[in-house]
Structures are given as C-alpha cells and as structure tokens.
Design a protein with these regions (language model features):
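Conserved ABC ATPase "signature" region
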Residues: 112, 123-141, 189-192
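Conserved ABC ATPase signature
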Residues: 145-149, 153
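The feature captures the beta-strand-to-loop junction immediately N-terminal to the Walker
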Residues: 47-49
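Conserved catalytic motifs of ABC-family nucleotide-binding domains
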Residues: 166
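Helix-to-loop junction immediately C-terminal to a conserved catalytic motif
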Residues: 62
Length: 252
C-alpha cells in the first residue's frame, strides 16, 4: 500500500488515503507532509499531543479545511477539492463529538431524513429504516421525540442515521470524550460492528489509552508530522513516542 518513498498510494479501491498533506495558518505551519491511509474493514487512530496537527488533518479529510498541498482520495478517486456533503455522497460518513440529532423529529424521522436523500425508492427506504431500527435495538423508540432520549439512546440513533447513507468509511471525532467506562465499551462494540460491516473507521481522540485498545493501528503525529505508524503494541513500545507523547509509565 506504499510507494517507493513509503507513502500511501492513491490509486487503489477500498482505501481512503491522504497523501503529503500540508497546511499553514498565517505564518504558523500546522501540518507538514502528512500521509495516512485507512482500509475498509479496519479501525485506525489519528493521535498525538496537543498542537500536533491531528485535528487539522482530520478536518482536511472531512472536507472542512482545504489543504495547502497534497491530495485526498477515496477508492482511487481524488476528492481533495470536494466539500463535506459531496464526500458524504461518495461514502464518507462523519459522527461529530457534539450531539447532532435532529431535535424536532422522532427517531424514525431522524433516520428517514437521511434515507430520503440517499435512497430513491419508497419501498427500499422503508425497508432500510426497519432494518436499522432492528440493528441498533431502537424499534421501541421509533415514535419517540429526539428530545426524550437518553444519552446512550441518542448516540445509537445518530449512528443508525449515519449508516443510513451506506458509508464506506466513518470518521469519529472524539467519541470517547467525557464518557464513563460502560460507554467506552459501547464505543468499542460500535467500532467492531462497523468493521464487521466492512466500513473503515478513522478515530481522533485525546483518550489515547482507550483508543489504542479499539483500533487496529494508529498514526502518531508530532509537530505536524507523522512520528510513527503501527499496531498499538508497536506504538507503546516505541521509545520516541514515549518520550514526546505517552510518557515512560504508560501501559495499555
């Protein structure tokens, strides 16, 4: 999956690839020649200390920030200049950290709002709706208003709604922020479920320990560059990663 310079190739299907991304804000260089790749059916972490550039890389992949240099491709198609909504139409889903449920709609209405933009046939829309209600055990909530949901119920509805567009990749922004251990387990189960569906998952989060327990591999950014890429145990064992990010006492 890499070229002669060790960077991800951009001509392969089944991959979401960022190649040699760079970004500056004024005179401050935030991202320097960052290349990452996510394959369908795997979970990848995008981690690093504050100011490492991970949030900027994440938002460039989403389509919210335009890179100064480099490219982004999906299934071999360059999407670098496409906005967020067009990337969504091509198969990139996004689950923000903040609540994103449509508060004035029922659970059924939340999911159907997405299906109506992605599925043409009425019968197929309703079949997909019923399948998602069952898949996420929210059928009993179908008529409930979004405002009446608990935090866990709301999250399940948001995930079901995100999957209504049939994404090939899901970008999870800080999914572990401020949640209790039970909810961490729910996120772990969610990521496993997405992988079983053949969906590639990219996670950025400040909770490095729990993220490394969830992902198959991760990229560690430092001062705007990729410091290391590898499996969680390889990252934890790396002396330089420990020095600048994890600390000597870190363990999984």
């Amino acid at each position: 999956m890499t070229d002669a310079q060790g960077k991800p190739r951009i001509d392969q299907t089944g991959w979401l690839v960022a190649h040699s991304l760079a970004k500056s804000f004024g005179k401050r260089v935030v991202v320097r020649d960052v290349s990452i790749a996510v394959r369908r059916g795997e979970a990848v972490g995008l981690l690093g200390p504050n100011g490492a550039g991970k949030t900027t890389v994440f938002t460039m992949i989403m389509g919210l920030v335009k890179p100064d240099a480099g490219s982004i491709s999906l299934d071999g198609r360059e999407i670098t200049r496409l906005p967020l909504f067009q990337r969504g139409q091509l198969g990139i889903g996004y689950l923000p950290q903040e609540p994103s449920i449509f508060r004035g709609l029922s659970v059924r209405g939340n999911i159907m709002a997405v299906l109506e933009n992605h599925v043409k046939g009425k019968a197929e829309r309703h079949a997909r709706l019923e399948a998602l209600l069952d898949e996420f055990s929210i059928r009993h909530l179908a008529k409930a208003n979004a405002l009446a949901l608990s935090g866990g119920e709301r999250r399940r509805v948001e995930i079901a709604r995100a999957l209504a567009s049939h994404p090939h990749f899901m970008l999870l922004d800080e999914p572990l922020a401020g949640i209790d251990p039970i909810a961490v387990g729910d996120i772990r189960d969610l990521v496993a479920h997405l992988k079983d569906r053949g969906i590639g998952v990219l996670i950025t989060d400040h909770n490095v320990r729990d993220t490394l327990k969830i992902v198959d591999r991760a990229y560690i950014l430092h001062e705007g560059r990729v410091l290391m890429e590898g499996a969680p145990d390889e990252i934890v064992a790396d002396a330089e990663v420990r020095r600048v990010y994890l600390g000597e006492r870190f363990s999984l």
